[in-house]
């Protein structure tokens, strides 16, 4: 192993709850959770007591092992308290954004049949009528009572007891896939999902992503998405101070500085926002040590700027179905060049990957060949999902012999890194040629004056489809400058892409529609761009 020495890891608890409670044993007076505005603060010993109290309330409502509990989230400490209280009983936390339309909440209930609902105080439902789908089950408002916080909690064996019947394979939570289209699917995640990769990093002595006891982390990511839930639970299991929810300003710079944040995880749009604020204020965040980012393709210039301030970065790639992160691209020599080329990283040790040249034909299919250099990515990770709840047909399509079909198209290059090209379902087929959307986006974003770019499909009788391109300019442009930028973009495509991949239409827009996790909503983009009568057509 190249002379590298590995330290034997102590036997760690096999559930998220037991790992958090272990931190409470070691540092009971340390703050575990609080909001950005300082409210809802919980010390680790107080968190243990609150978990026990809320679990008792659920037990009184006949919630037990295997029950589903709808957690109406506001991303604050009460949301994570709810998840841990469910874990105390072996119940499954079904994560739902508190600002979702009632119809979406009711659809989630139809899919998961919850036995109870926990409502965080900052969610829309906390101050409005309860949806009809919840009328038949107990609905509990989660509130961290001041009298409870001010009392002295002793950490005895009973309060620190987790659930002896639970292990790493038992389910902890469900997250509904955001996606850009299609029916919502409830991704069932085991306890191991939230610590498998951190355990690998510790065992292998890798510093790609690191956690330090007592450090402050901040997550603006929703607890209803894998990135937010994974990040905060992981930091709790490592004894961090987790700041989440309760934002009293839109300024990321102010939040990070005021709370002396050491680590954070952002989607690329928020990373761009932070860079813009740092440049405008000519400032740095002295406490900041690490910025993780993922969810969609990042802008290399943003990563370069952050790293120039002395802050490490780590791009993480994964899906809800793969347990957040399966590939990683940390700060390293040449990492910026790789990001510019569309790299998303390389797999962690213990994570297997396979590129299928034929869509739908996975690594264990009869006659499957070796991994291709380009194709649909399959991942076998110890963090992979258990399956889609109550959806065996879809589970059988996506999860085969422990391998998850990501649906993403990637290229593996000689440097061992993987480069994203788009989703197989979003491929644009022009004149029989497969066009990878992310490659089109990447070429456009390499043009000076382009802040963001995303392509979309334009139906065409002759070719089947043409490529349309929407661009967000780096600065406000008049008509002449806009036309010049479009011609510059077209010229770059003539130099760098095959003819069928060259945009037939280029439109400058103010923003690109994205999901909460930062993925481009290409169907919405196509509809909006097509309706824009002011667009300029550029043939090239």
Curated annotation (Swiss-Prot):
Cofactor: Mg(2+)
Free-text disruption phenotype from the record: Cells lacking this gene are shown to be highly attenuated in a mouse tuberculosis model.
Record's subcellular location: Cytoplasm
Keywords, ordered alphabetically: ATP-binding, Cytoplasm, Fatty acid metabolism, Ligase, Lipid metabolism, Magnesium, Metal-binding, Nucleotide-binding
Subunit: Homodimer.
Protein name in UniProt: Medium/long-chain-fatty-acid--[acyl-carrier-protein] ligase FadD10
Residues the record lists as binding ATP: 226, 316, 320, 408
Encoding gene (name): fadD10
Organism: Mycobacterium tuberculosis (strain ATCC 25618 / H37Rv)
InterPro entries from the UniProt entry: AMP-bd_C, AMP-bd_C_sf, AMP-binding_CS, AMP-dep_synth/lig_dom, ANL_N_sf, ATP-dep_AMP-bd_enzyme
Amino acids binding dodecanoyl-AMP: 315-316, 408
């Amino acid at each position: 192993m190249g002379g590298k020495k590995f330290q034997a890891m102590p036997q760690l608890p096999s559930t998220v709850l037991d790992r958090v409670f272990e931190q409470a044993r070691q540092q009971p007076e340390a703050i575990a959770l609080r909001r950005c505005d300082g409210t809802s603060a919980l010390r680790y010993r107080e968190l243990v007591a609150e978990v026990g109290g809320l679990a008792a309330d659920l037990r009184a409502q006949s919630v037990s092992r295997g029950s589903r509990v709808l957690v109406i989230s506001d991303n604050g400490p009460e949301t994570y308290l709810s998840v841990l209280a469910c874990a105390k009983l072996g119940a499954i936390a079904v994560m739902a954004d508190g600002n979702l339309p009632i119809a979406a909440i009711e659809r989630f209930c139809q899919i998961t049949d919850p036995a109870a609902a926990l409502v965080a105080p900052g969610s829309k439902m906390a101050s409005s009528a309860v949806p009809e789908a919840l009328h038949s089950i107990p609905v509990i408002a989660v509130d961290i009572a001041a009298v409870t916080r001010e009392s002295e909690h002793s950490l005895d064996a009973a309060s620190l007891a987790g659930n002896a019947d639970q292990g790493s394979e038992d389910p902890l939570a469900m997250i509904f896939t955001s996606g850009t289209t299609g029916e919502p699917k409830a991704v069932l995640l085991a306890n191991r999902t939230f610590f498998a990769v951190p355990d690998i990093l510790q065992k292998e002595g890798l510093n790609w992503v690191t956690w330090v006891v007592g450090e402050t982390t901040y997550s603006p990511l929703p607890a209803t998405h894998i990135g937010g839930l994974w990040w905060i639970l992981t930091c709790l299991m490592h004894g961090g101070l987790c700041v989440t929810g309760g934002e009293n300003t839109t300024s990321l710079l102010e939040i990070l500085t005021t709370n002396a944040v050491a680590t954070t995880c952002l989607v690329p749009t928020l990373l761009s926002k932070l860079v813009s604020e740092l440049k405008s204020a000519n400032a740095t965040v002295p406490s900041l040590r690490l910025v993780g980012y993922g969810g969609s393709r990042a802008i290399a210039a943003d990563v370069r700027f952050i790293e120039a301030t002395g802050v490490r970065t780590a791009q993480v790639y994964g899906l809800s179905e793969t347990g957040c992160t399966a590939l990683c691209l940390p700060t390293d020599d040449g990492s910026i060049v790789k990001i510019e080329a569309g790299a998303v990283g390389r797999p962690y040790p213990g994570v297997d990957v396979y590129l299928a040249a034929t869509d739908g034909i996975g690594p264990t299919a009869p006659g499957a060949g070796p991994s291709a250099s380009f194709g649909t990515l399959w991942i076998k990770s110890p963090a992979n999902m258990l399956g889609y709840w109550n959806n065996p047909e879809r589970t059988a399509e996506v999860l085969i012999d422990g391998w998850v079909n990501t649906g993403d198209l990637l290229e593996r290059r000689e440097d061992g890194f993987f480069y994203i090209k788009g989703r197989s379902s979003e491929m644009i087929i022009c004149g029989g040629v497969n066009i990878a959307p992310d490659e089109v986006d990447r070429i456009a974003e390499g043009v000076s004056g382009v802040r963001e770019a995303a392509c979309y499909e334009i139906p065409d009788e002759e070719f089947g489809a043409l490529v349309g391109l929407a661009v967000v300019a780096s600065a406000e442009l008049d008509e002449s400058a806009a036309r010049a930028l479009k011609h510059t973009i077209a010229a770059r495509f003539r130099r760098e892409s095959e003819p069928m991949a060259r945009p037939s239409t280029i439109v400058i827009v103010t923003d690109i529609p994205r999901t909460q996790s930062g993925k481009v909503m290409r169907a919405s983009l196509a509809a909006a761009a097509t309706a824009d009568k002011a667009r300029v057509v550029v043939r090239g």
